[in-house]
A protein has these predicted regions:
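Conserved G/P- and acidic residue-centered "switch" motifs that form tight phosphate/ATP-binding loops
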Residues: 66
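STAS-like cytosolic regulatory interaction modules
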Residues: 1-63, 75-126
Length: 126
C-alpha cells in the first residue's frame, strides 16, 4: 500500500494505492467532477510515469462522476495504450456502467466485475 502525495483534494479522492510489480490499483471515492478532475489527472499521470502494464481504478467508493472524469479516464487510457498498457475500471456501479454505455465509452474502457476481490485480481493478472 502506498499513500498519495499529500495534496488535500487527492487525499480526499484516493483511499489508497496498491502496487504489485507491473500492476497498480487506485481506490477512488467521493465525487469525480470538474472540481477534482485536474488533480485526478495529475495523480493518474504520475502513476502512468511508473509504467504499469495495468492500471486499475477501483470505483467502489465513487458516488458520482461527470464528463470531466470520463475525459480523465479516456486520456489515461490513450496514454497507457500508447505504452502497450491497459486501464481498467473496477467495481463500476450500475450508474457508472450506464454512463459509459450512454457515452459509448463502454467499448473503449475496460471494466472488471464488481466484487470485493476484483481489484486484487488486477494485481495478480499481469
Amino acid at each position: 500500500m502506498d499513500g498519495t502525495n499529500g495534496h488535500p483534494v487527492v487525499d480526499e479522492l484516493v483511499d489508497r494505492i496498491d502496487r504489485d510489480g507491473e500492476s497498480t490499483v487506485v481506490y477512488l471515492s467521493g465525487e469525480l467532477d470538474l472540481l477534482v478532475s485536474p488533480d485526478l489527472q495529475t495523480l493518474l499521470d504520475t502513476e502512468c510515469e511508473r509504467h504499469p502494464r495495468r492500471l486499475c481504478l477501483d470505483l467502489t467508493g465513487v458516488d458520482f462522476l461527470d464528463s470531466s472524469a470520463l475525459h480523465v479516464f479516456v486520456h489515461t487510457h490513450k496514454r497507457l495504450a500508447g505504452e502497450s498498457a491497459r486501464l481498467e475500471l473496477v467495481s463500476c456501479t450500475p450508474a457508472v456502467r450506464r454512463l459509459l454505455s450512454l457515452t459509448s465509452l463502454d467499448w473503449l474502457l475496460a471494466t472488471c466485475a464488481s466484487s470485493p476481490t476484483a481489484a486484487q485480481r488486477c494485481l495478480r493478472l499481469m
